[in-house]
Amino acid sequence: MAALLYLRRRAAAAALAGVAPKPQWLATAARRGALVSGDDGGETGERGKSPWLQLPPFAPLDAAAAARAISRGGGEGGDGEQGATAIKWVRRCCPDLPTSLVQKLFRLRKVKKNVVTAEISSADASAEQHRLRRVSAKDQLMPGDILFLPVNLKESSVAEKTKKFDNRNEINFLRGLEIYKDEAIIVVNKPPGMPVQGGVGIKNSIDVLASMFEENSSEAPRLVHRLDRDCSGILVLGRNQLSTSMLHAIFREKTADALADGTQHVLQRKYVALVIGTPRHPKGLLSAPLAKILLQDGKSERLTIRASSNAASVQDALTEYRVIESCPQGYTWLELFPRTGRKHQRFLEPQLLGITSMDGKRIRSGCLFPCHGQLMRNCSGKGSFPLGLLWVAEASLRSNLSFIYTASKWFFLMSQWLFIGCSLQTLILISQILRSSTLLLHCRCICG
């Protein structure tokens, strides 16, 4: 009784002072919001800090339909999804959380949903009061529903990220690759030699290091497409679940529609390649059936061009090409526009033209080692980038040509070419290429 009288007096004093009393539901939610690790307390220890991590409001948008409309240049993306369960929405918004942890959160009643209730005040005015209520894994969500998770999930993920990546030079190097960033996407200039996805023997890759592009965020950017390890160029990452789903669908839509019709789509891929030889026609369309064959070791695979596309394992590859410029020494700059996104498609495109590619380890006769000129201390021997990336410089003609690298913001000066002892034939080629004003338009595209 004494406690109840105290609460009434406190509420009356707050009303006289013009300050609204603290809602009881917030204190109750804080007490129930114990840490998943087993802590007893619910308060975070900082005044005014919410004990809950708020997920984006549930939006029943069909990402595939929206991406289809965007890729075709249309308008609305069609009807949305009929609905989603609470556990499905948590997995979409927090793909980095293990499935076992998500299920544990629902079992321990750590997942809440906002509930709006209407109460009648003393002035008979309608007032909305937001409350948090436990939600089960199979509960259906309505548009606008907001789910809440314990805030310690975000804090623990940020602490783990900071502990894992504490090398400031590596972090600065990665963030220096950033070209564009907004609320939905991040665009980076992937260096050569860095794999996009991890695997056996791969320590650092874009998908592992993606969290370094975010400051104090538990949601790391997600991959939506890939580039080959030896290829440099623009790589797009999604910053949230919705943008990632739509970008995934846009890339899939492009490949599927390229085989169905000749419709011009919003998404366009472009590569710039230095090749040996000159195509017969200045532009055209390449079409070839590609297939994988298993090598004798039983583990490795090789991509080959088949005579026909009747086999089930054969995939058609389509690429448009255009000659930028050629020189009398027999080298040509090419623009390649892949319509399909087949694995290692770009390595076989020059072979279809009867020429030899000057990049890629899969073509040993023209093996190059592209490198950023800004980071080179000398022009011979070997060196290294952060994160274990290597560059190699030799005195041969082909390795000198490897320095023709049009990364954004970085160009070699002619004096550096003279310093490394390039032959006259090489300098003629370089002067012809650098004299072309069209090359400046491709300063954000990389050879290959």
UniProtKB/Swiss-Prot annotation:
Annotated keywords: Isomerase, Mitochondrion, RNA-binding, Transit peptide
FT transit peptide: 1-69
Per the record, its GO cellular-component terms are: mitochondrion
Grouped into one coarse class, the protein's main location is mitochondrion
- Tell me the GO BP annotations in alphabetical order: enzyme-directed rRNA pseudouridine synthesis
Q: Which reaction does it catalyse?
A: a uridine in RNA = a pseudouridine in RNA
State the active site. Answer: D228
Q: Does the keyword Isomerase apply?
A: yes
Ranges of residues in domain S4 RNA-binding: 84-170
Q: Which InterPro entries match?
A: PsdUridine_synth_cat_dom_sf, PsdUridine_synth_RsuA/RluA, RluA_PseudoU_synthase
Give the EC number: 5.4.99.-
One Gene Ontology MF term: RNA binding
Q: What Pfam family is a match for this entry?
A: PseudoU_synth_2
Location relative to the cell? Mitochondrion
Q: Which family does it belong to?
A: Belongs to the pseudouridine synthase RluA family.
Can you say what this protein is called? RNA pseudouridine synthase 4, mitochondrial
Upper lineage is: Eukaryota, Viridiplantae, Streptophyta, Embryophyta, Tracheophyta
